[in-house]
Amino acid sequence: MKKLTTIALLFTMIGSMFLLSACGEEEEDLSSKIEEKVIAYQTDLEDSASTLTSTEAIRDYLSNWAKSKGIKYSVDSHNNVIMSVNASKEYKEADPTVIVCSYDAKQFNNNIEPMAMALYIAKNNESTGKLDVIFTSEVGHDYAGIKSLDQKYFKDNSNVFCLNGGEKNMWSTSTGARSSYTFSNNVAYTAPTGEKAYKIKISGLPGGIPDSKISSYPNPIKELGDLLAYFKTNALIYELADITGGSSGNLYPKSSSMTIVIDEDDIDKFESRMETAMENFNDNYLEDYPEMTYTYEEVPLPEKVVTEEYQNEFVSMLYTLLDGVYYKDDDDNLISITSIGAIHSKDGSYTISAVGNSLSESNMSEIDTTYKTICGLSDIRYKKYDEQLGFSSDMESEFAKAVAAAFNKYSDADMEYKDCVPATNASYVYEKNKKSNIINVSVNEDKMERYTGTIITFMMDQTHTEVAD
């Protein structure tokens, strides 16, 4: 009898070993599958980036991709692409999952990782519950697509993951509020008195959404404004012909340029000041932004320059405007940021566009007031043309706990929810249905595979039954 018991125990141990081995292989297979395929989607998006330079081109790319994969899709009147996957028999009772991911031709490279995640989930959801993967259109991060999206996609029991690119990888149940501004003034022109004109340009920066890297991002518009102030304090007389940069107030500018006129007797002084400015700038930023260039070159003399009175007011205002970290709390946590995103001239008027993001309502109000005050002192027209409420949900909710559990199960690590200072699409989803479960996901390529695996694991862990063959 003892011998039989020993043999039975041996078979039990062997069976357990096979079971554990099978589970380990299953998890490893899922991880390997995700890593291989999500990187493939990322690579294809990167390789296609040179052709995806308009809303229509990206919309068609997504539509054709869904069609080629046999995924049901639709496109609404605002160029939102909605891919839909029905629940499998096993997951008929599972709550629906919604993936929301924006695309924007003005900052396409910053959307690639979340788009790759969303494409993977649409095609490889492991036969789980009802799934909608929604790609919302944007132009200069204006949220146009999500604002116009039909609320029918967000049910009371929907589990919504808002995917966004970011400097930091994190899961958030709170995201910041946003205000978008323009500051405009008319300028007068006169004929130049100097004999030499130079174009100064900073370019090759990645752009993107203002976020936690703002203190280390070299804003080219602000840098050129500071350069003009530097010239003034170092007794270099110049005349400003034009200055331009950026494509949207809601984004970091990728480049900026200006043309100034100087007296030919000041050429040596000008070149000396420029060499110093360029050397300091490159020392500070070139290592982190190797594609960036800072140049100047002689150009034909312009027919007109801004008058001295308007030039002084304009340069003073540009130098004074908020740009960068606005507030950190006592624990050095980032709370509020501001960014100058664009500057352009038209019909004798200059317009500067900027944005503020904050987790604090009082800070957001202070930023509004500060910008308004600066404009008032310089006789500049101030306008807050758009605003967005922050989003906050309970990090102790059953949904948040389930996502954290899926993260732990997939990666064998603990998740910590962190507040996201930049405003995100999560607040617009919340406006459409306050009963939906919503989490914001900020991701770059470092955690793309792990975060994809977390969402897939969460979906696999939803209510389901085994269906007999």
Functional labels for PLM-detected ranges:
Residues F18-A22:
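C-terminal motif of bacterial Sec signal peptides marking the signal peptidase cleavage site
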Residues G24-L30, D329, I335-V355, K401-T465:
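Zn-dependent metallopeptidase/amidohydrolase metal-coordination segment
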Residues L30-N109:
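Acidic/His- and Gly-rich active-site-bordering loop/insert found
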Residues V98-G145, Y181-F183, K199-G204, D211-F231, ...:
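Alpha-helical metal-binding/catalytic segments enriched in His/Glu/Asp
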Residues K106-T193, I209-D211, K328-D332, S339, ...:
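Acidic/histidine-rich catalytic neighborhood of metal-dependent amide-processing enzymes
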Residues L131, S216-N234, I267, Y310-K328, ...:
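His/Asp/Glu-rich mid-to-C-terminal helical/loop segments that flank catalytic regions of hydrolases
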Residues A191-E195, S212-T244, N250-L251, T259-I337:
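Acidic-enriched catalytic cores of C-N bond-cleaving enzymes acting on peptides and small amides
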Residues S212-G246, L377, Y385, S392-N433:
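Active-site-adjacent substrate-binding region
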